[in-house]
Regions:
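Receiver (REC) domain active-site loop signature in two-component systems and cognate sites
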Residues: 53-55
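Residue-level signal for the "D+5" position in two-component response regulator receiver
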Residues: 30, 57-58, 84, 92
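Basic, amphipathic DNA-recognition helix from helix-turn-helix-like DNA-binding domains
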Residues: 65, 69, 74-125
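Charged docking surfaces used in two-component/phosphorelay signaling
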Residues: 15-23
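Active-site beta3 strand of CheY-like receiver
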Residues: 43-50
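Conserved sequence signature across two-component system core domains
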Residues: 7-8, 31, 49, 99
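Short hydrophobic/Thr-rich beta-strand motif most characteristic of the beta2 strand and flanking loop
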Residues: 25-32, 40
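Acidic catalytic/metal-coordinating carboxylates
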Residues: 32-36, 59-62, 86
Length: 125
């Protein structure tokens, strides 16, 4: 199964997402800000990233831009920012999908599976 990095400054959200994904057999890495996420990506074999936008130190948008400079992995933004402009910005900076909070955990799991399926099919994984 795939390795997934979940990055959000809300530890409860990270834990909840981790529980759902672990039940599906995924291995979870955790980060609580954008810099931490970049460090995990540089040191661990991660297949997909779920990242929040509004975080301290390095927000999800700037983190996604930096990550895209060196890593083609699928990125799903998970954010309370639900305006169309926010979604468009997230996708334009390199995210592959955008899910708004509050979210349905089962939908998030389905989107993770979909992104991993596409990524694997394209031969990048």
């Amino acid at each position: 199964m795939a390795n997934i990095l979940v990055c959000d400054d809300d530890k409860d959200i990270v834990e909840a997402i981790s529980i759902y994904l672990e039940q599906e057999g995924y291995t979870i890495f955790k980060a609580y800000d954008g810099m931490e996420a970049i460090n995990v990506l540089r040191s661990q074999p991660v297949d997909l990233l779920i990242i929040d936008i509004m975080m301290p130190k390095l927000d999800g948008i700037r983190a996604t831009l930096k990550i895209r400079e060196e890593n083609p992995l699928p990125i799903i933004i998970l954010s309370a920012k639900s305006e169309d402009a926010d979604k468009i910005l997230g996708l334009n900076v390199g995210a592959d999908d955008y899910v708004t909070k509050p979210f349905n955990p089962l939908e998030l799991v389905a989107r993770v599976k979909s992104q991993l399926r596409r990524y694997t099919r394209l031969g990048a994984a």
